[in-house]
Amino acid sequence: MENRKHTSLKDLAQALGVSIPTVSRALKDSPEISRELCAKAKALAKEMNYRPNPFAMSLRKNAPRIIGVIVPDIVTHFFASILNGIENMAIANGYFVIITTSHESYEHEKRNIENLVNMRVEGIIACLSQETTDFSHISALKDINMPLILFDRVCLTDQFSSVIADGAQSAQMATQHLLDNGSERVAFIGGANHLDIVKRRKHGYLEALRENRIPIEKELVVCRKIDYEEGKIATETLLSLPQPPDAILAMNDTLAFAAMEAVSYTHLRAHETRR
């Protein structure tokens, strides 16, 4: 018997130069797809003898409802607690959760989104990586009507729903607390300046200084990467200033723990030097 290769949706998509979800919708006359592309897809399917796999279709119909989640990591307490909340809520509402990590990589983030779309998840919840400055892979989800909710590190808030804490107010309150307790030179350690969350928290810090009529000193604001080692380097940079700060506001737990270690180590070295 002749061993014939069955034409797949992937074959049709490659021939048409579109994505697999797009050609699938075109074959179903989706109103989201142009009439011209629908006609082309059907004609090509007939020409290439494409036949839908009834077994695969049956599996899809009976598949559990799935939500895809993308986070920078699963080690940080913040993201671990967020994932716990997402999964608990999803299970309570009959959904299954697929968790992926970007490892703070733009390329990993893009690949995760592509994979989740190809898996036909019903929606995606994501926190952007620190490397992400191009949002074309995010805006493309709008074109295929893929529901997306961004949290913590967000973008394109006019197109997608987002969940964020009031970073500006919390940073302002924390800075004010340090000032009220006698600190006069409060430094700020944050992540990369392009991140919206960093902008908001830095704004709150600066606003507290302005309200207290304290001059803003650029050398007291160190924004690097949200990373433990980078946090230690930032703290050591601040402590090496001719006039070091007497308090440090770190924008998250990772940087705060890094700052505490660096301060402790610096004081230990100073003590050993004096002995």
Regions found by a protein language model. Give the residues of each.
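Bacterial carbohydrate/catabolite-sensing allosteric modules
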Residues: 1-4, 15, 20, 47, ...
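N-terminal helix-turn-helix DNA-binding module of bacterial transcription factors
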Residues: 1-65, 257
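N-terminal helix-turn-helix/winged-helix DNA-binding helices
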Residues: 2-8, 46-84, 92-95, 103-104, ...
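Short gly/ser/thr-rich secondary-structure transition/capping motifs
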Residues: 47-53, 107, 129-130, 260
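A short acidic, amphipathic alpha-helical/loop segment
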Residues: 82-85, 112, 136-140, 259
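Central regulatory/effector-binding core of bacterial HTH transcription factors
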Residues: 88-134
